């Protein structure tokens, strides 16, 4: 005689996730289901994981764009290219400033090393403008403190 399983009752300790009413606006929005890893379970209830923040220079690139060309927009792909460019230049300047600090047997990167790194990395007139803008920014920062 084959054994039949009887329907098991749920134990009171395990809870099912609470049912929510559907959101306005149909698909999409904040409450839309996203792919990826599921959250951890705590006492039988699914715990929602916080999404990791993606840092970007996007807002600053946009502010500069609006200062230079107020009526011009930027696509997300162009923004991605600009973000990669800023990251690349930042890494190059930081690496060069670090090397200069090591050559001078110092342990702290100062504004002088950063300025020299900019002069070494950027060509001619671009380096002059970058140095003057950097000096202006450092002066503004020190006077505001």
From Swiss-Prot:
Motif mapping: SPKK motif 1: 6-9
Keywords of the record: Chromosome, DNA-binding, Glycoprotein, Isopeptide bond, Nucleosome core, Nucleus, Phosphoprotein, Ubl conjugation
Post-translational modification: Monoubiquitination of Lys-140 gives a specific tag for epigenetic transcriptional activation and is also prerequisite for histone H3 'Lys-4' and 'Lys-79' methylation.
Gene Ontology MF terms in the entry: DNA binding; protein heterodimerization activity; structural constituent of chromatin
Compartments in which it is found: Nucleus; Chromosome
Location, primary (coarse class): nucleus
Modified residues (Phosphoserine): 16, 21
Matching SUPFAM superfamilies: Histone-fold
Position of sequence motif SPKK motif 4: 21-24
Glycan-linked positions: 132
Motif SPKK motif 3 per record, residues: 16-19
Function: Core component of nucleosome. Nucleosomes wrap and compact DNA into chromatin, limiting DNA accessibility to the cellular machineries which require DNA as a template. Histones thereby play a central role in transcription regulation, DNA repair, DNA replication and chromosomal stability. DNA accessibility is regulated via a complex set of post-translational modifications of histones, also called histone code, and nucleosome remodeling.
Protein name: Histone H2B.1, sperm
